[in-house]
Amino acid sequence: MVKIVIHEERCHGCGNCVIACPVNACNSPNVWGGKGPEDGEDVVIKVVNGTVSVINEDLCEACMTCELACPVDAIEIKT
């Protein structure tokens, strides 16, 4: 089972992780275009009120792309 840990004190809501996530890109045309996902789309993470939030951890494939995309090490994938 995958656990996504968000270090909210570090996150500044840039959205790099949201756009980098391949699951998000496959499930949301907006993410594929470099924008945030819409409400109701099947995504793993998204920026909510200026901080990244886990939306559906079960969709995470533990590829670590989001973790690598974060410039401030605010997201951590634990397997």
Curated annotation (Swiss-Prot):
It is an enzyme of class 1 (oxidoreductase). The keyword Electron transport applies. It catalyses: N-formylmethanofuran + 2 oxidized [2Fe-2S]-[ferredoxin] + H2O = methanofuran + 2 reduced [2Fe-2S]-[ferredoxin] + CO2 + H(+). Residues 2-31, 51-79 form the 4Fe-4S ferredoxin-type domain. Not inactivated by cyanide. Its cofactor is [4Fe-4S] cluster. Binds 2 [4Fe-4S] clusters. Pfam families: Fer4_7 (PF12838). One of its GO terms (molecular function) is formylmethanofuran dehydrogenase activity. [4Fe-4S] cluster 1 binds at C11, C14, C17, C70. InterPro entries: 4Fe4S_Fe-S-bd (IPR017896), 4Fe4S_Fe_S_CS (IPR017900). Pathway: One-carbon metabolism; methanogenesis from CO(2); 5,10-methenyl-5,6,7,8-tetrahydromethanopterin from CO(2): step 1/3. Keywords: 4Fe-4S, Electron transport, Iron, Iron-sulfur, Metal-binding, Methanogenesis, Oxidoreductase, Repeat, Transport. GO terms for biological process: methanogenesis, from carbon dioxide. [4Fe-4S] cluster 2 binds at C21, C60, C63, C66. Its EC number is 1.2.7.12. Catalyzes the reversible oxidation of CO(2) and methanofuran (MFR) to N-formylmethanofuran (CHO-MFR). This enzyme is oxygen-labile. May function as an electron transfer protein. This is Tungsten-containing formylmethanofuran dehydrogenase 2 subunit G. It comes from Methanopyrus kandleri (strain AV19 / DSM 6324 / JCM 9639 / NBRC 100938).
